[in-house]
């Protein structure tokens, strides 16, 4: 395989740009995709995002988390710089932890239509409690729907030891 042709990258506008515009309000329009060159194969793509920040919708206090986003692509894949800028757009966005991870998953489903996706947020403690929301999705009527159900019920059977993150 010779790599990607320029025409395959025409929708990737942020990567390599000399001018990066950071959105300070939630904006899913910043997300970009590129074609999956291996749609005949199941494989997992995982993003580890240790610097996610959002705001408490009630107090305006900052919330910090590590996000884990994993998916099995179909035809489209999310471009990583656009994902970084998208996650940055949550910086001044007020939402609960549970809503944030579900919003991220829903936006990525709409963008890529993956076979399977999961988003797990591991938020730092506030008031002595950490919240770790997990959500996932598998295409309806496929084996990925079954995988999603299994993963949901078994995703945290062996929780880590919390050492104040």
Curated annotation (Swiss-Prot):
One of its GO terms (cellular component) is cytoplasm. It is an enzyme of class 1 (oxidoreductase). Substrate binds at residues 78-80, 97-98. The keyword Thylakoid does not apply. It holds the Pfam family QueF. Keywords: Cytoplasm, NADP, Oxidoreductase, Queuosine biosynthesis. Catalyzes the NADPH-dependent reduction of 7-cyano-7-deazaguanine (preQ0) to 7-aminomethyl-7-deazaguanine (preQ1). NCBIfam families: QueF-II. This is NADPH-dependent 7-cyano-7-deazaguanine reductase. The lineage of its organism: Bacteria, Bacillati, Bacillota, Bacilli, Bacillales. The gene is queF.
């Amino acid at each position: 395989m010779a790599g990607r042709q320029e025409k395959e990258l025409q929708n990737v506008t942020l990567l390599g740009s000399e001018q990066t515009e950071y959105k300070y309000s939630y904006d899913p329009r910043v997300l970009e995709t590129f074609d999956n060159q291996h749609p005949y194969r199941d494989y997992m793509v995982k993003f580890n995002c240790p610097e996610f920040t959002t705001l408490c919708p009630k107090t305006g206090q900052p919330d910090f988390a590590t996000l884990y986003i994993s998916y099995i692509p179909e035809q489209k894949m999310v471009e990583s710089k656009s994902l970084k800028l998208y996650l940055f757009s949550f910086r001044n966005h007020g939402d609960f932890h549970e809503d944030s991870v579900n919003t991220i998953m829903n936006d990525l489903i709409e963008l890529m239509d993956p076979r399977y996706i999961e988003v797990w947020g591991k938020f730092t403690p506030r008031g002595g409690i950490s919240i770790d929301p997990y959500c996932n999705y598998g295409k309806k009527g496929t084996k990925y729907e079954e995988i999603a159900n299994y993963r949901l019920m078994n995703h945290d059977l062996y929780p880590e030891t919390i050492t104040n993150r």
